[in-house]
Amino acid sequence: MKVLVIGGAGYIGSHAVRELVKEGNDVLVLDALYTGHRKAVDPKAKFYQGDIEDTFLVSKILRDEKIDAVMHFAAYSLVPESVKKPLKYYDNNVTGMISLLQAMNDANVKYLVFSSSAATYGIPKKLPITEDTPLNPINPYGETKMMMEKIMAWADKADGIKYTALRYFNVAGASSDGSIGEDHAPETHLIPNILKSAISGDGKFTIFGDDYDTKDGTNVRDYVQVEDLIDAHILALKHMMKTNKSDVFNLGTAHGYSNLEILESAKKVTGIDIPYTMGPRRGGDPDSLVADSTKARTVLGWKPKHENVDDVIATAWKWHKSHPKGYEDK
């Protein structure tokens, strides 16, 4: 199968590329390298540098390479930044999706796996969150993901482009061999920031907010390991092509951990006492997000291998220890 991975040089996309290659697929990558890393891309994948909003380029790649399916990871994804710069997010994320669907329709490519988000749910009235939980995003990032899902649904009705939207909870960890992992600049995610602080010993790690409606006052999140996440993408693609139906799945472990619990787990995994300071809340952060992923486990046969957060952090630690400066290509 020929798969185009858009955003395939990014954190999650690069893991998808690697696993698709490992399974024997013919993999192509399109990435503008705004935030991604060329070094993260599996050398067996064919690489194009370009923007998802370049409809002509995307359409040409789809036609010339005779692509069977697309995986879409190319969206801005920082909640606080989206609150400060909403137009940047609507422009890139929503316009990018429209451009991609136009290109897919032009090239008669009918299968799309989309990187959606639990941010589409906003502040749920009850936990865990199922796929039927109402969508009510509280920040521009979550709203763009919701809009992208709705656009795909209309494109399915109008043009027959089938899609699977995978609503991620908090993605973490790295490849089990430690060769690729998370490298953002600036880094905003909790686990890599804790581990970077463990390596540097600078004592500059900050937890944002201790007045949330949770057991210890800090955010509670559901952490899904990145390789487990990619297993779900590949299962979803196969299921969609077999059934020729669009669908939506939550991807999480159904276990919620507070920021302070993650810090304690990181101390245990690393063997390092990691000091921290408590800062103010960040804009747009819900109190708790915990997934009910029964549907993915039942329909797709998804079986995450890293359900214990210590195991997730251990894979991230392996990457950060061996790559303390990330890919060093920026």
From Swiss-Prot:
<feature type="binding site">
    <location>
        <begin position="11"/>
        <end position="12"/>
    </location>
    <ligand>
        <name>NAD(+)</name>
    </ligand>
</feature>
<feature type="binding site">
    <location>
        <position position="117"/>
    </location>
    <ligand>
        <name>substrate</name>
    </ligand>
</feature>
<keyword id="KW-0520">NAD</keyword>
<dbReference type="GO" id="GO:0033499">
    <property type="term" value="P:galactose catabolic process via UDP-galactose, Leloir pathway"/>
</dbReference>
<feature type="binding site">
    <location>
        <begin position="31"/>
        <end position="36"/>
    </location>
    <ligand>
        <name>NAD(+)</name>
    </ligand>
</feature>
<dbReference type="Pfam" id="PF01370">
    <property type="entry name" value="Epimerase"/>
</dbReference>
<feature type="binding site">
    <location>
        <position position="117"/>
    </location>
    <ligand>
        <name>NAD(+)</name>
    </ligand>
</feature>
<feature type="binding site">
    <location>
        <position position="145"/>
    </location>
    <ligand>
        <name>NAD(+)</name>
    </ligand>
</feature>
<keyword id="KW-0413">Isomerase</keyword>
<feature type="binding site">
    <location>
        <position position="169"/>
    </location>
    <ligand>
        <name>NAD(+)</name>
    </ligand>
</feature>
<feature type="binding site">
    <location>
        <begin position="51"/>
        <end position="52"/>
    </location>
    <ligand>
        <name>NAD(+)</name>
    </ligand>
</feature>
<feature type="active site" description="Proton acceptor">
    <location>
        <position position="141"/>
    </location>
</feature>
<dbReference type="InterPro" id="IPR001509">
    <property type="entry name" value="Epimerase_deHydtase"/>
</dbReference>
<keyword id="KW-0299">Galactose metabolism</keyword>
<comment type="function">
    <text>Involved in the metabolism of galactose. Catalyzes the conversion of UDP-galactose (UDP-Gal) to UDP-glucose (UDP-Glc) through a mechanism involving the transient reduction of NAD. It also could be involved in preparation of carbohydrate residues for incorporation into complex polymers, such as exopolysaccharides.</text>
</comment>
<dbReference type="InterPro" id="IPR036291">
    <property type="entry name" value="NAD(P)-bd_dom_sf"/>
</dbReference>
<feature type="binding site">
    <location>
        <begin position="282"/>
        <end position="285"/>
    </location>
    <ligand>
        <name>substrate</name>
    </ligand>
</feature>
<comment type="similarity">
    <text>Belongs to the NAD(P)-dependent epimerase/dehydratase family.</text>
</comment>
<keyword id="KW-0119">Carbohydrate metabolism</keyword>
<feature type="binding site">
    <location>
        <position position="141"/>
    </location>
    <ligand>
        <name>substrate</name>
    </ligand>
</feature>
<feature type="binding site">
    <location>
        <begin position="189"/>
        <end position="190"/>
    </location>
    <ligand>
        <name>substrate</name>
    </ligand>
</feature>
<feature type="binding site">
    <location>
        <position position="221"/>
    </location>
    <ligand>
        <name>substrate</name>
    </ligand>
</feature>
<dbReference type="GO" id="GO:0003978">
    <property type="term" value="F:UDP-glucose 4-epimerase activity"/>
</dbReference>
<feature type="binding site">
    <location>
        <begin position="73"/>
        <end position="77"/>
    </location>
    <ligand>
        <name>NAD(+)</name>
    </ligand>
</feature>
<protein>
    <recommendedName>
        <fullName>UDP-glucose 4-epimerase</fullName>
        <ecNumber>5.1.3.2</ecNumber>
    </recommendedName>
</protein>
<feature type="binding site">
    <location>
        <begin position="206"/>
        <end position="208"/>
    </location>
    <ligand>
        <name>substrate</name>
    </ligand>
</feature>
<feature type="binding site">
    <location>
        <position position="170"/>
    </location>
    <ligand>
        <name>substrate</name>
    </ligand>
</feature>
<feature type="binding site">
    <location>
        <position position="92"/>
    </location>
    <ligand>
        <name>NAD(+)</name>
    </ligand>
</feature>
<feature type="binding site">
    <location>
        <position position="141"/>
    </location>
    <ligand>
        <name>NAD(+)</name>
    </ligand>
</feature>
<dbReference type="InterPro" id="IPR005886">
    <property type="entry name" value="UDP_G4E"/>
</dbReference>
<comment type="pathway">
    <text>Carbohydrate metabolism; galactose metabolism.</text>
</comment>
<comment type="subunit">
    <text>Homodimer.</text>
</comment>
